[in-house]
């Protein structure tokens, strides 16, 4: 049986489902992503458009949340300054495990065209990133694709993999 295959057997006339706990847990996690939006610049406009009726993020099971305690995906969209770095780290730490991060746009990925002393050259220097979304500014369809890539990544991992990292003091 493949890792994510569900088999249906006939047992006395009743269907029986054979699968793994990892498959069931990851299926639930991947189809109910609650996103904490952290929009900082132009990419935030495209991120907001993805939640509107035309693109309808809800059909992927993605719901935008305003609180990090209710979210399991953080979408960082736009230029990250050094003043925001501590704040974004605090928001990330407040999210419960398992948690994932999507870096949206060239500015969030690499600092974009703003190579200054006040700009963080990629949000992966502050928080771990799972999916990088290139472009300036990426279209809502691209953000939907990034969510689907994240869903595939979640379905492949072990349900017990996401343990809190050891903190270095």
From Swiss-Prot:
Gene3D superfamilies linked to this entry: 3.40.50.12280
GO molecular function: 4 iron, 4 sulfur cluster binding; iron ion binding; NADH dehydrogenase (ubiquinone) activity; NADH:ubiquinone reductase (non-electrogenic) activity; quinone binding
Disulfide bonds: none
SUPFAM superfamilies in UniProt: HydA/Nqo6-like
Compartments reported by the entry: Cell inner membrane
Keywords, in A-Z order: 4Fe-4S, Cell inner membrane, Cell membrane, Iron, Iron-sulfur, Membrane, Metal-binding, NAD, Quinone, Translocase, Transport, Ubiquinone
Cofactor note: Binds 1 [4Fe-4S] cluster.
NCBIfam families: nuoB_fam (TIGR01957), PRK06411.1 (NF005012)
Name of the featured protein: NADH-quinone oxidoreductase subunit B
High-level lineage: Bacteria, Pseudomonadati, Campylobacterota, Epsilonproteobacteria, Campylobacterales
Chain's gene name: nuoB
